């Protein structure tokens, strides 16, 4: 619910015909002579666009949202009329709050305070309820101690569902009812365990109110028997490290290990009656529940998306709430690859006398929008073609329109469209005849939207009415200051193109050339892939002026960078994605090597200084690319890599590689190690010399390497590495004074073989 604190000032700009100046369909190159510096680019870009994010309020008046004034008060504003009303005075706002959520009728606010991070999305907090009319602040639980995991308002009444100690509670008008009694270290009610949070939901909750607020669907996870993994924290955020590191034990299922089991439950809010719904779509040990959605405007029907363990078979199961009867209303075999969990089911209601819900599927080979009957039956395709729907932005059941983003122009672009599920007519809301990257945020009733142009030029945001997508009502964010600032700089020259593989597929490439590029000079090159399944790095979104832009701009470095999206990456169709199924690390490095050979056809490319650097999956890809020993790459930097997918978590790995039993040949037989420390030891024991291997540990950092000053140190080290590599001369490799070859040169001694 966090919203912009400066939006109300921006709205004073008034009516705008169109963004000025108009954006060219290409990245900016600047207009001056200044070059980007290290401090401007790392550890994060300081020269960057601003954007506004709104949490729209569903009220009688469309276009309303909550903003915060300079003194901290919460203001109800209308983005169209600029009218505003103070809902919560500044002196009623809890100090140091982390987040807040308004009750649907705007009569109360739920505050989260005393935030303590848990995993990527989850956290612990205290929660308080502010009655706006009375001004009273009441704790959600009288004895709370910063230990509540999640809380959510009912959509219709005065109830709050919350989770504490992995048990589910319902609060209503000051009275609390404990729903479950079995929550504990291994049993989770209404919140996901670590692997479901990280790999399935991408969120911290596993409970869903019915639209009328009368029922609650929730999942229960049981981690009993799931192997544990211990994470040591050596400094543990202390100035002086403790004598013994703090050890965090989490249940971390690896490939072919036991997974958490999951159950589906329904709760009648009024009676507190809980019902366990048997899940028979797949056996308990072969079951993943990926999504839950209510398929009614009240509480008649709810559905869940069930996958088998390796996520290449899918069943949508509908549950009739009154009878508790379950029925498979849709199923799919995706054993040619995997089935992505897109979390895109949404009930739309009656269409020509039959109830439907909308969903995205790539069963045709391309991700498209379909209408599916609530009770099962033949689907209706709303979009088709050799392009993909990326996301559904809004379903407007009054106008019978679905708003979405797609790659219709090109896989690297995003344009906003609507499609009528009555007439199937598809309409662009933007100019879809040129390369651009858009998204949109729609008001609660769908009457207005903020259109966000995100690249390739300087981003901006405008407000539109859905009745007229040609003329903006207002400019929300112009980024005029950034436009002016960039005129002082000479920026890297960014371009996009495709290269064609011998097998016929094309790979998207993003190239950065130094600002003072001279085609008659030789330049070192750094490849910067991610390359993971379904991911995308090469897009027309704003080119962040980050570390990659710095090493391209610094006169002492002047690296050309190439980012190549290999086979397996996203938005180019199912066949392109699924090519890597059961063999991660096989095709991806081949594609990077092929791209490097294509690069070397340019006379300016220095064949003696071609590097590759990747993070996470990109770190894995870096190592696998060097492992090919192609003779093309001369150095690699692998950051936070997965090194052996048998040792990564089960729900990610098995989606793409299956289990060891199903894919014995798919395991990496070349390097066996638990983590990067073991890899380092393996390489040293394998005879790799000190001048060819450098390692650095960031012991207390998470995957993003953000603890304390770790990020600052990391980028200084990266800058030194690429500088040292540029200075390296293949005819005279650097040698330490103790090298036998140096001694031989100095004293005429014969160096030992």
UniProtKB/Swiss-Prot annotation:
The active site is at residues 616, 668, 703. Belongs to the peptidase S9B family. It is found in: Secreted. GO terms for molecular function: aminopeptidase activity; dipeptidyl-peptidase activity; serine-type endopeptidase activity. Its EC number is 3.4.14.5. This is Probable dipeptidyl peptidase 4. Keywords: Aminopeptidase, Glycoprotein, Hydrolase, Protease, Secreted, Serine protease, Signal, Virulence. It comes from the Eukaryota. GO terms for biological process: proteolysis. It comes from Trichophyton verrucosum (strain HKI 0517). It is an enzyme of class 3 (hydrolase). Residues 1-18 form the signal peptide. PROSITE patterns: PRO_ENDOPEP_SER. Extracellular dipeptidyl-peptidase which removes N-terminal dipeptides sequentially from polypeptides having unsubstituted N-termini provided that the penultimate residue is proline. Contributes to pathogenicity. One of its GO terms (cellular component) is plasma membrane. Transmembrane segments: none annotated.
């Amino acid at each position: 619910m966090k919203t912009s604190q400066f939006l109300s000032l921006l709205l004073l700009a008034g009516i705008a015909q169109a963004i000025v100046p108009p954006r060219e369909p290409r990245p900016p190159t600047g207009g001056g002579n200044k070059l980007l510096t290290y401090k401007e680019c790392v550890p994060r870009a300081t020269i960057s666009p601003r954007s506004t994010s709104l949490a729209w309020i569903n009220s009688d008046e469309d276009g309303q949202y909550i903003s915060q004034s300079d003194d901290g008060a919460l203001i109800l504003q209308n983005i169209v009329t600029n009218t505003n009303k103070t809902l919560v005075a500044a002196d009623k706002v809890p100090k140091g709050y982390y987040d807040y959520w308004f009750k649907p009728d705007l009569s109360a606010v739920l505050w989260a305070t005393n935030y303590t991070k848990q995993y990527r999305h989850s956290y612990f907090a205290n929660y308080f309820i502010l009655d706006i009319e009375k001004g009273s602040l009441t704790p959600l639980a009288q004895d709370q101690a910063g230990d509540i995991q999640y809380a959510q308002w009912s959509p219709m009444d005065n109830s709050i569902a919350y989770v504490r100690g992995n048990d589910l509670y319902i609060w209503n008008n000051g009275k609390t009812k404990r729903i479950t009694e079995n929550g504990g270290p291994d049993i989770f009610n209404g919140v996901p365990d670590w692997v479901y949070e990280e790999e399935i939901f991408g969120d911290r909750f596993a409970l869903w109110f019915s639209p009328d607020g009368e029922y609650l669907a929730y999942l229960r996870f049981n981690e009993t028997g799931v192997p544990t993994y211990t994470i040591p924290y050596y400094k543990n955020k202390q100035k002086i490290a403790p004598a013994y590191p703090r050890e965090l034990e989490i249940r971390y299922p690896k490939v072919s290990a036991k997974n958490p089991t999951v159950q589906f439950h329904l709760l009648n809010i009024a009676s507190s009656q809980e019902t366990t719904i048997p899940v028979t779509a797949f056996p308990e040990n072969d079951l993943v529940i990926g999504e839950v959605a209510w398929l009614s405007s009240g509480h008649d029907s709810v559905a869940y998306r069930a996958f088998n363990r390796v996520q290449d078979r899918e069943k949508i199961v509908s549950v009739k709430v009154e009878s508790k009867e379950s029925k498979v209303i849709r199923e799919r075999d995706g054993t040619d690859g995997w089935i992505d969990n897109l979390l895109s089911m949404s009930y739309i209601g009656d269409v020509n006398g039959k109830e439907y819900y909308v969903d995205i599927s790539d069963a045709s080979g391309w991700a498209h929008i379909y209408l599916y009957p609530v009770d099962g039956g033949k689907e209706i395709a709303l979009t088709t073609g050799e392009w993909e729907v990326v996301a559904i932005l809004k379903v407007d059941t009054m106008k019978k329109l679905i708003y979405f983003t797609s790659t219709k122009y090109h896989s690297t672009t995003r344009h906003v469209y609507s499609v009528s599920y009555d007439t199937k007519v598809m309409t662009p809301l933007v100019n879809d005849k040129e390369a651009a990257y858009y998204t949109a945020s729609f008001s609660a009733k769908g009457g207005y939207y903020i259109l966000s142009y995100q690249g390739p030029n300087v981003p901006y945001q405008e407000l539109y009415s859905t009745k007229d997508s040609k003329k903006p009502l207002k400019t929300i964010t112009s980024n005029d200051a950034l436009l002016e600032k960039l005129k002082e700089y000479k920026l890297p020259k960014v371009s996009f193109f495709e290269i064609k593989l011998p097998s016929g597929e094309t790979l998207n490439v993003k190239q950065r050339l130094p600002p003072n590029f001279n085609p008659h000079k030789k330049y070192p090159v750094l490849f910067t892939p991610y390359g993971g399944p379904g991911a995308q790095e090469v897009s027309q979104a704003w080119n962040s002026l980050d570390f990659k832009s710095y090493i391209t701009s610094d006169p002492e470095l002047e690296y050309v960078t190439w980012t190549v999206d290999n086979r397996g990456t996203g938005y180019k169709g199912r066949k392109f994605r699924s090519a890597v199924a059961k063999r991660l690390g096989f095709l991806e490095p081949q594609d990077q090597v092929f791209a490097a050979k294509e690069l070397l056809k340019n006379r300016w490319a220095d064949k003696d200084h071609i590097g590759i650097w990747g993070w996470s999956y990109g770190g894995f890809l870096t190592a696998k690319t060097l492992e090919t020993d192609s003779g093309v790459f001369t150095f690699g930097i692998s950051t936070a890599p997965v090194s052996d997918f048998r040792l990564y978590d089960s729900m990610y790995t098995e989606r793409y590689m299956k289990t060891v039993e199903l894919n014995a040949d798919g395991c990496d037989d070349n390097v066996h190690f638990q983590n990067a420390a073991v890899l380092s030891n393996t390489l040293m024991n394998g005879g790799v010399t000190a001048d060819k291997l450098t390692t650095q540990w960031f012991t207390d950092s998470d995957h993003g390497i953000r603890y304390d000053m770790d990020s600052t140190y990391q980028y200084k080290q990266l800058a030194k590495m690429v500088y040292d590599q540029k200075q390296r001369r293949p005819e005279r490799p650097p040698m330490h004074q103790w090298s036998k070859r140096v001694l031989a040169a100095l004293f005429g001694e014969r160096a030992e073989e």
